[in-house]
Curated annotation (Swiss-Prot):
Produces ATP from ADP in the presence of a proton gradient across the membrane. The gamma chain is believed to be important in regulating ATPase activity and the flow of protons through the CF(0) complex. One of its GO terms (molecular function) is proton-transporting ATP synthase activity, rotational mechanism. This is ATP synthase gamma chain. It comes from Escherichia coli O139:H28 (strain E24377A / ETEC). Pfam families: ATP-synt. It is a peripheral membrane protein. It is found in: Cell inner membrane. F-type ATPases have 2 components, CF(1) - the catalytic core - and CF(0) - the membrane proton channel. CF(1) has five subunits: alpha(3), beta(3), gamma(1), delta(1), epsilon(1). CF(0) has three main subunits: a, b and c. Keywords: ATP synthesis, Cell inner membrane, Cell membrane, CF(1), Hydrogen ion transport, Ion transport, Membrane, Transport. One of its GO terms (cellular component) is proton-transporting ATP synthase complex. GO terms for biological process: proton motive force-driven plasma membrane ATP synthesis.
Length: 287
């Protein structure tokens, strides 16, 4: 059994670590609330944009935009949103596992996959497993802007425009609540039709002014950008929630470990006192 002094040192070490994890839990909780506010502010725009685009997919368009047309799939692209920092439980690895499983279904069909990474954890992971990373952006902090994200988005849209990509997806964690974040893979291009049953039984006609091509070019690009930005802010809220939960679990585990060490310390101290008493009694008996 370890000595009492060594056990006291371990208890002090765990207590110091517990203070750190508790502070990180509180910081993550504060950042999560701010991230939730940003997510709530951007979600109505993203959802309305998705609804408008869903109307277009069901509409009788006088100009058929390339983003609305299905192609034979030879290469697909993924915009992957991960975190820049760790200590957020299984948030990243669960997302990566889901993506790897989907990529395998494509590669089994002879389809190649390109990856545009947002977040350093995704960059390091997919470089280590041999993924074809064609664009990346990292270090966006806790308040990302669209201008910081636009690089990888432009790379993938250009590849799609030039016919080098036939499908484009966004991969990110969807924030459900503090305890639940769901890894999701959503198709961006070609434009997915809305799931709204009412739309499937209606014919949508639009009048474009001044020019349908110019309007759709701008609108559909803005749609992709809005979905990517929404994915990033939701992933950020998911990151802070996962980190808060992970740090709370670490703090609670530290408390349990301290109790166990305190029990061991008490036993060691009791054994030491018993030994000293035995030695005193033995010495007195010898006299």
């Amino acid at each position: 059994m370890a000595g009492a002094k060594e056990i006291r040192s371990k208890i002090a070490s765990v207590q110091n670590t517990q203070k750190i994890t508790k502070a990180m839990e509180m910081v993550a909780a504060s950042k999560m609330r701010k991230s939730q506010d940003r997510m709530a502010a951007s979600r109505p725009y993203a959802e309305t944009m998705r609804k408008v685009i869903g109307h277009l997919a069901h509409g009788n368009l006088e100009y058929k935009h390339p983003y609305l047309e299905e192609r034979d799939v030879k290469r697909v692209g993924y915009l992957v949103v991960s975190t820049d920092r760790g200590l957020c439980g299984g948030l990243n690895i669960n997302l990566f596992k889901k993506l790897l499983a989907e990529m395998k279904t494509w590669t089994d069909k002879g389809v190649q996959c390109d990856l545009a990474m947002i977040g350093s954890k995704g960059v390091s992971f997919f470089n280590s497993v041999g993924g074809n990373v064609v664009a990346q952006v990292t270090g966006m902090g806790d308040n990302p802007s669209l201008s910081e994200l636009i690089g990888p988005v432009k790379v993938m849209l250009q590849a799609y425009d030039e016919g080098r990509l036939d499908k484009l997806y966004i991969v990110s964690n969807k924030f459900i609540n503090t305890m639940s974040q769901v890894p999701t893979i959503s198709q961006l291009l070609p434009l997915p039709a809305s799931d709204d049953d009412d739309l499937k039984h209606k014919s949508w006609d639009y009048l474009y002014e001044p020019d349908p091509k110019a309007l759709l070019d701008t609108l559909l690009r803005r749609y992709v950008e809005s979905q990517v930005y929404q994915g990033v802010v939701e992933n950020l809220a998911s990151e802070q929630a996962a980190r808060m939960v992970a740090m709370k679990a670490a703090t609670d585990n530290g408390g349990s470990l301290i109790k166990e060490l305190q029990l061991v310390y008490n036993k060691a101290r009791q054994a030491s006192i018993t030994q000293e008493l035995t030695e005193i009694v033995s010495g007195a008996a010898a006299v």
